[in-house]
Every structure is written in structure tokens, then in C-alpha cells.
A protein has these predicted regions:
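Contiguous segments within soluble domain cores/interaction surfaces
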Residues: 33-42, 48-113, 117, 127-131
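Short beta-strand elements
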Residues: 136-147
């Protein structure tokens, strides 16, 4: 009888425990895509994915370790697919020059091509150049996933 009572108490005790916590997906944070250049680093901060019709926002951070960096120069959006790559949009962005520390510039793309037509779901690339005070040019690019 004692064993039965102990078993019942044990079952009641263990069944009153809380349920395991519900697992949720972690929030999607921004991605920082670093590129090393001859005299420092360029970071491009983007979202993991964008929604069709949403204005694309990317932050470009120039961080020279010596000398200066200037950019983004000649920025454009290109589409990549089975048939190769194609320039979708040339962007008008005022470049910045950084001599010490770091500085940022925000890039906005309204998901339209050069003729003003809205574009759809695809993998796009933000491509631009940076130049250092020695005249060395580095091309930087990052993928923008639009779904």
C-alpha cells in the first residue's frame, strides 16, 4: 500500500510540472557584410531579406585604419540570374570621405529600375567602389534578397 501511495504522489508531483517552454525563432537582425580594403574596412549593413515593394535600406560604413577612404562611388543595383547579370538601377548617392574613425552613409533603393518600372522578387546586388588616398579602387558588393 505504501508503494502505491508513493507512486501516486510521485505521478501527481511530476504531472504538475510546467510544460517545456515554447521555442520561438530569434528575431532577424541586420547582417553586417565586411570587406577588407588596402587601408581599412568597409561594412555594408543590410537585412537578411526584403519584401517586394519595400524600400531597400543599406548602410555603408567606411573605416580606414590609415589614410582616407572615399565612397560609395558609382553605386548601382544589379540582378543576377540564370542568364547572367544585368544593371537594374544606377543610384545617386553623395559619397563621403573619412580620414579617421568611421563614418556611414545610407543607401535607399525604391525597387525601381532606371526607367522607373517596379522590379519583383529576385536576388539583387548593391555594387559600388571605394578609393583610398593612394588611388587604389576596391569594388564592394553585397546581395539583397527580395522575396
Amino acid at each position: 500500500m505504501r508503494r502505491l501511495a508513493a507512486l501516486i504522489v510521485l505521478l501527481v508531483f511530476t504531472s504538475c510540472g510546467s510544460a517545456p517552454p515554447v521555442r520561438t525563432s530569434p528575431p532577424v537582425s541586420d547582417l553586417v557584410i565586411p570587406t577588407t580594403v588596402p587601408n581599412g574596412k568597409v561594412d555594408v549593413v543590410v537585412k537578411a531579406t526584403y519584401t517586394v515593394g519595400e524600400t531597400i535600406r543599406a548602410t555603408i560604413r567606411l573605416s580606414p585604419t590609415t589614410g582616407t577612404l572615399r565612397g560609395p562611388l558609382d553605386p548601382f543595383i544589379q540582378a543576377s540570374g540564370f542568364h547572367g547579370t544585368a544593371t537594374v538601377r544606377h543610384l545617386a548617392i553623395d559619397p563621403i570621405s573619412v580620414g579617421a574613425g568611421s563614418a556611414e552613409v545610407v543607401v535607399l533603393w525604391d525597387m525601381r529600375d532606371d526607367s522607373g518600372t517596379a522590379v519583383g522578387s529576385d536576388d539583387y546586388s548593391l555594387v559600388f567602389n571605394v578609393i583610398d588616398d593612394s588611388g587604389r579602387t576596391t569594388t564592394v558588393g553585397t546581395t539583397l534578397q527580395v522575396r
